[in-house]
Amino acid sequence: MVNDKDLLSFDYKKDFPLLAANDVAYLDNSATTQKPACVIEAERDFYLKHNANPLRGLYDLAMQATDIYEDARVAVQKFINAKSEQEIIFTRNTTESLNLVAYSYGLANLKPGDEIVTTIMEHHSNMLPWRMVAQQTGAVVKYIECAVDGSISDEAIDAAVTEKTKIVAMAEVSNVLGRLNPIAKAISAAHKVGAVAVIDAAQSAPHMAIDVQKMDADFLAFSGHKMLGPMGIGVLYGKKELLEAMPPFLSGGEMISFVSRDGQDSNIMRMHSFYRKGKNTLVLLCSFTADNMHTGNILHSIKR
């Protein structure tokens, strides 16, 4: 374990060009973080040395770009201890990740009378998509009651989750209160009634080790920009068997093996439809990987 004295004495500002060059005390990290030099340099390095379209071409630069793309997924897989890199979906942010689950999984699996359980402290990105999906499917949104201090008890979770519950959606850490919520209990309660658990880790991933296998979350979402990475990159983790069964959220290139004029003979590859439609800004993936390693090293040092 790294002691508090060592953590406090380290000059963290030198890693961040904006902070090192200015007399600034930046305290808005829950909204977005400043970027360390390694992230900025990785972005610049990509444009200088590797810029090409991944997953398509067979020439050297395209192959390098593809390697960078796939290496980024492996890096995130290791960061959250997913079973496979195929369980890592790159999105634009946590909001898009949660909407992907709500609209792809939710619309396909909810029916009238089903219940979606969440909390009143959720970020709107983990509340409004469920309300909108409930309106379209006839499902009902229920809220786990919070105590006056903002805490959530095991009893409150048990009272909210019933045999009608199909989805339990909860933030691991509240973006308003900063509270660490009992997601282990929420996930366990969901699985006891056959529901899936959706975890918003936007505020927890930057500050604590995430182990999706240990927590047994079905889906988990977070953003790069809240954990020293670039804006425009988010992550959705989903258990492979759930992703394989979900209909496409968006459609486009690299998600289909062939297509006919009338569409009747088209062959959609479901897993590919999530992580290969269109192109994420590859340079952001490159810098996000650098950030991922930077953040991972810090968390590992603190844990050790």
What is each of the regions a protein language model found here?
Residues 1-304:
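Pyridoxal 5′-phosphate
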